[in-house]
């Protein structure tokens, strides 16, 4: 097994230095951290992801690098959300939001992204109202600072739609879902995000209309999602496997058992290969 630096080097000591001397901030190597993170994610090595992020967060804290801490808390809240660890996700979300204010970054796109991430954490753990509060802040930020074709805008619209659905605001949710699909259609490999959104729309239609009344609409949305997931040009990497695993149970819920099995087979094949 290859040892990484974080496996054997202790974080810098925050108390080291001359008495009474305040150490200057020392930035952590963000590019290298993210490159290694994506490598672990592509291999679906989630234990390595956690170890890697926690190591570098300790480094950023020891080195008084608050911008580095912001980036790492953003990554950690997303990691713990995917691992369904509520307390840890909330802890890092709250810290990231706090750092935005401390750094005076409220008017930056980074702030918008942090609010999206924090809202997604709250929506994921059953607080759609709290999620929407962050999403509205992010929407004002993004629509001011980003072109509407930016993938981050599409991701925000999708997350807002999920929270609106959970709040029973179905018409607003459908409008947001369709905005998300339009944006993602302009992205390279955007088929995966579009597929997820069509499946989210199927769930929203069932919630709004009831299973029987929504049947035809749900079938249309599932067929569109399946076609997108079958796009041959999509890279068969760790993220593709993650999306397959995320989407498969939705197809199973609606009786598309062959599609469910095929998606799980693809995910397993990728994991075994990597």
Feature-to-residue mapping (PLM):
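Residues that mark the junctions of alpha-helical repeat units in TPR/alpha-solenoid scaffolds
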Residues: 29, 49, 62, 69, ...
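Amphipathic alpha-helical segments of tetratricopeptide repeats
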Residues: 54-59, 95-102, 139-144, 178-186, ...
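Alpha-helical segment of the N-proximal tetratricopeptide repeat
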Residues: 26-63, 78-82
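Short coil/turn linking the two alpha-helices of tandem helical-hairpin repeats
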Residues: 104, 119, 146, 188, ...
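Short coil/turn linkers that connect adjacent helices within long alpha-helical scaffolds
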Residues: 23-24, 62-65, 102-106, 144-148, ...
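Conserved alpha-helical positions within TPR/SEL1-like repeat arrays
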Residues: 31-42, 70-82, 109-124, 151-166, ...
């Amino acid at each position: 097994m290859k040892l990484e630096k974080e496996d054997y080097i202790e974080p810098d000591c925050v108390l080291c230095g001359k008495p009474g001397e305040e150490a200057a901030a020392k930035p952590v190597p963000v590019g290298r951290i993210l490159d290694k993170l994506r490598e672990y994610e592509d291999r679906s090595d989630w234990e390595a992801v956690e170890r890697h992020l926690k190591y570098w967060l300790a480094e950023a804290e020891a080195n008084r690098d608050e911008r580095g801490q912001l980036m790492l808390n953003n990554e950690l809240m997303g990691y713990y959300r995917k691992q369904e660890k509520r307390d840890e996700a909330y802890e890092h979300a709250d810290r990231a939001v706090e750092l935005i204010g401390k750094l005076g970054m409220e008017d930056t796109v980074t702030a918008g992204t942090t609010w999206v991430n924090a809202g997604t954490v709250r929506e994921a753990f059953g607080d759609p109202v709290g999620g929407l509060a962050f999403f509205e802040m992010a929407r004002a930020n993004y629509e001011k600072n980003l072109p509407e074709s930016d993938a981050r805008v599409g991701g925000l619209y999708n997350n807002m739609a999920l929270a609106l659905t959970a709040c029973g605001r179905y018409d607003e949710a459908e409008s947001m879902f369709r905005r998300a699909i339009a944006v993602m259609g302009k992205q390279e490999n955007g088929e995966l995000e579009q597929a997820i959104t069509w499946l989210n729309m199927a769930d929203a239609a069932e919630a709004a209309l009831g299973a029987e009344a929504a049947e035809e609409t749900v079938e249309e949305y599932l067929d569109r999602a399946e076609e997108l997931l079958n796009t041959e040009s999509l890279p068969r990497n760790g993220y593709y496997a993650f999306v397959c695993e995320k989407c498969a149970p939705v197809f199973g819920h609606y009786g598309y058992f062959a599609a469910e099995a095929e998606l799980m087979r693809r995910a397993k094949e990728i994991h075994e290969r990597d």
